Amino acid sequence: MKLWKIGITAALLSLGAAFGASAQSALNEILDSGTLKVGTTGDWNPMTLKDPATNSYKGYDIDIMTELAKDLGVEVEFVPTDWKTLVNGVVAGKYHLTGSASISAARMKVAGFSDSYIAVEIVPFTTKDKADRFDGTDSINKADVKVATTLGTSFEKMVRDWYPDADIKVVEAPARGFQEVIAGRADVFITSNIEGSTLEAKFPVTRVKNVEAPSSTPIAMIMPQADQVWINYVNNWIELKKGEGFFEATREKWGL
């Protein structure tokens, strides 16, 4: 009887040790390795923008992640990714979290999110020479209107939900929907009010008249779904930095 009890105890201890090893938080890995790995697309100005000449990044996200790494006492490594594989990179452990991404039900099925620290409105844009053609959502949701979007993005799902009768053109990253519209290969694209303002300053595009954003879209970091230790750390860090005015100052720096 005593031998049976000893055997059971040993088995439970072995299982507990194995569970503890497999359940080690990304936080421990980051602190042990001295590196915070961040997945970023480098194509969402002014959130994250990659300079192909230097392979360096700049933007709102980049400042946030650099600050997070600094407070962790580690270096930051930006790992290139694209929108269609952004979530997969977190799930596969290629990086510890992502830069800013919209919170969606589809993404929540397989990944976790930090608390939101900024929100955006998603609205349609067209070129200035076509501005008079569009007035309201119904003017876009037609078979003779080509709406461009990027594969695997939350924008793709929104386009399909909002404009089911339109001719939807899906392009793969690094191509972007707005590029198709500027090149004359599509009529309308959707993007955040943040990126839209940047594009309006650089290209002959304009917001479609009389279309209100359905609602604000919360933005957060995508994180490993089961790693509550890491999620708790980041959420508390976000709350702390909000109190210090860091997020507000960073928004002002990038004109958000």
Where are these regions (language model features)?
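A structural signal for short loop-to-beta-strand junctions that line the ligand-binding cleft
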Residues: L27, Y57-D61, M108-V120, R207-E212, ...
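Short helix-initiation/N-cap motifs at beta->coil->alpha
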Residues: I62, E77-N88, K169-A183, S215-T217
